[in-house]
C-alpha cells in the first residue's frame, strides 16, 4: 500500500483527553517495568512546535489515550491533521515529540510511516516508557522503518520522565521522584531497543568500519542523555560535506533544516604509522560529537600525537570544558581544532568555553580554503578536486575576525599567539 494522508481518509475528529493527567495515572501507566501485562491502556503525551532557526515555537501540547479501539497514535494523527495541518501553512515545518507509555504496535507504526511519507514538513521524536511486544518480528521491523523514515525512537530516560512530569502531570508543584529501579529498567528497555534498531542504522562504505557502543556521562548539559549510541564512519558523501560544512551565516542554517554537528579527526603519531581518521556525528538530543571523540581517543591510550579536528560548529561550553580538561591531563598531545562556524558566539558562556580551550593549549581556528580542501581530500573524495562555493573565503575571513575579537575581549590574544608559535612535531632529540 502506498503513502496516503490518514487525516483525509477519516472524517471523525478526536480530541485530547486533557492537558494534564493525575500523578497516580502517570506513575501507574508510565512506570517502565520489564513486564507490565496489566497495563493495557496507552497514553501519549505530545508537544508540537513550529520549527524556527532561532528557537522552536511551542504550538500545542496535551495527552491522548486509546479510544473506541483506536490507538492513541492514530487519534493524534487525526487531530493533528484537522487542527494543525488544515489551519497553518503547508510550508510550515513542525517538530512533534511523543512521550508514550507503550511503543507503537506494528499497525500504528505502519500508519505513522505512511503519514510521515505524505507530510515531508514533519519530524517526529518518539520516547516510550516500555516496548510493546518486542519479540514480534513485525513490531521490530516497523520500529526500524520508523527510524529509516527519519523518526527518532528512544526509550524514556530520567530526563524524559522529569520533563513529562513537569509538563503533562498535575504535579501540584512537586518534583518528580524516580521510582525504584527506574534507571535499571531504562537500561533494559534501551538495550532491547538498540538490539532491534541496530540492523536499520545507515550503512557506511565497505572500506570503513562502524562501531556501536554505549557511553555513560557523569555530568553535562540538561539535555544530555545518560546512555547513548555512537556511530563512527570514515567518509562523508559529497552532498553531506557541501550541506554540513557550508560556512554561511547562522540565520540561514538551523538544525531543523538538516544542519548537523559533524567532527572529522585525523591522528598523526610520531612513530611513523599511517594517520588514523574518522568522522563522528551528533544526533539531536543525544551525545555531542566532541564527547564521542574524547571517548574514542581515551580508549586508544595515546601520548605523543598530533590531532587535527574539523568541526561544522564550534564546541558548546560543556564540550569545550571537557576538551580542555582532557588536554590539560595530556600536555604532550597537540590538538588543533578548525571550525566552519561559531556556535552562539555572542553568548558569554560559549565565549568562555572557547577561552578554556585556548587556556588549555588547544589551538582553535576558523576553517579557510586550505582547511576545507584538506577536509575534502581526507574525508570525502581524494580523487576529485574540491570546488569552493561562492563567498567561502569572504565568510571565513569574517568568522576569523569574529573569533579574533573574542580572543581580544577576554585578553587572550598574546596567549594564543604563543601557542601558535609552538613547534608542531616530535620533540628534538
Curated annotation (Swiss-Prot):
Matches recorded under CDD domains: cytidine_deaminase
Stored Gene3D superfamilies: Cytidine Deaminase, domain 2 (3.40.140.10)
Cofactor dependence: Zn(2+)
Catalytic residue list: 73 (proton donor)
Root EC class: hydrolase
MF-aspect GO terms: cytidine deaminase activity; RNA binding; zinc ion binding
InterPro entries reported for this sequence: APOBEC/CMP_deaminase_Zn-bd, APOBEC_Cyt_Deaminase, CMP_dCMP_dom, Cytidine_deaminase-like
Main subcellular location: cytoplasm
E.C. number(s) listed in UniProt: 3.5.4.38
Coiled coil: none
Annotated ranges, domain CMP/dCMP-type deaminase: 38-154, 238-357
Disulphide-bridged cysteine pairs: none
Subcellular location: Cytoplasm
PROSITE patterns noted in UniProt: CYT_DCMP_DEAMINASES_1 (PS00903), CYT_DCMP_DEAMINASES_2 (PS51747)
Residues that, per the record, bind Zn(2+): 71, 105, 108, 288, 316, 319
GO biological process, one term: regulation of viral life cycle
Keywords: Antiviral defense, Cytoplasm, Hydrolase, Immunity, Innate immunity, Metal-binding, Repeat, Zinc
Catalytic reaction(s) noted: a 2'-deoxycytidine in single-stranded DNA + H2O + H(+) = a 2'-deoxyuridine in single-stranded DNA + NH4(+)
GO cellular component: cytoplasm; nucleus; P-body
Family named by the database record: Belongs to the cytidine and deoxycytidylate deaminase family.
Quaternary data: Homodimer.
Function field: DNA deaminase (cytidine deaminase) which acts as an inhibitor of retrovirus replication and retrotransposon mobility via deaminase-dependent and -independent mechanisms. Selectively targets single-stranded DNA and does not deaminate double-stranded DNA or single- or double-stranded RNA.
PANTHER family given in the database record: DNA DC-DU-EDITING ENZYME APOBEC-3H, MRNA EDITING ENZYME
Domain commentary: The CMP/dCMP deaminase domain 1 confers deoxycytidine deaminase activity, whereas the CMP/dCMP deaminase domain 2 mediates RNA-dependent oligomerization and virion incorporation.
Protein's UniProt name: DNA dC->dU-editing enzyme APOBEC3
The species this protein was found in: Rattus norvegicus
Source organism phylogeny: Eukaryota, Metazoa, Chordata, Craniata, Vertebrata
Gene behind the chain: Apobec3
